[in-house]
Swiss-Prot record:
InterPro entries per the UniProt record, alphabetical: BtuE, Glutathione_peroxidase, GPX_AS, GPX_CS, Thioredoxin-like_sf
Gene that encodes the chain: btuE
Protein known as: Thioredoxin/glutathione peroxidase BtuE
Active-site residues, record numbering mapped to chain: C37
Disrupted-gene phenotype: Deletion has no significant effect on the binding, transport or utilization of vitamin B12 or other cobalamins.
Catalytic activity from the UniProt record: 2 glutathione + H2O2 = glutathione disulfide + 2 H2O; a hydroperoxide + [thioredoxin]-dithiol = an alcohol + [thioredoxin]-disulfide + H2O
Pfam families per UniProt: GSHPx
Length: 183
């Protein structure tokens, strides 16, 4: 049986140690983010869906990560400033973490254990492009790249995992969120 991710200890972007329990009862989209990535414009869509559904109990949670071509090199303060001034991010952001390897954060250990594979867009060539560039994940369940997403239900259990190239406003992601909000 899957454990709730809500008891996991995390550090917010301002350095406060907390758990995700304060988000209990909400549907969450947990995303590993980066500021200098070709997928960084997804911040805009993440903010759009956060604003559209926050009143229904939906929240995006951003976890910066510098493991993919060092595309998140800044300090937490620099990341926060960039996200708020460039993309108008209002959703909760957290301290930079590792999502793969020996230093994988316990949150991502739980997320990946609950959803070892990601749903990708039909005919997506993203994984093949990563492999062709020598950037294949070390293990099949590793996070592939920045902006991989995990949808978590109100009970703290993982519902689905979405590949980095599946945008937040993709119809499959949107429908999954709507179904989770209806529960």
């Amino acid at each position: 049986m899957q454990d709730s991710i809500l008891t996991t200890v995390v550090k917010d972007i301002d350095g406060e140690v907390t758990t995700l329990e304060k988000f209990a009862g909400n549907v969450l989209l947990i995303v590993n983010v980066a500021s200098k990535c070709g997928l960084t414009p997804q911040y805009e869509q993440l903010e759009n869906i956060q604003k559209a559904w926050v009143d229904r109990g939906f929240m995006v949670l951003g976890f910066p990560c510098n493991q993919f071509l060092e595309q998140e090199p800044g300090s937490d303060e620099e990341i926060k400033t960039y996200c708020t001034t460039t993309w108008g991010v209002t959703f909760p952001m957290f301290s930079k973490i590792e999502v793969n390897g020996e230093g994988r954060h316990p949150l991502y250990q739980k997320l990946i254990a609950a959803a070892p594979t990601a749903v990708a867009p039909e005919e997506s060539g993203f994984y093949a492009r990563m492999v062709s560039k020598g950037r294949a994940p070390l293990y099949p369940d590793d996070i592939l790249w920045n902006f991989e997403k995990f949808l978590v239900g109100r009970d703290g259990k993982v519902i689905q995992r979405f590949s980095p190239d599946m945008t937040p406003e993709d119809p499959i992601v949107m429908e999954s969120i709507k179904l989770a909000l209806a529960k």
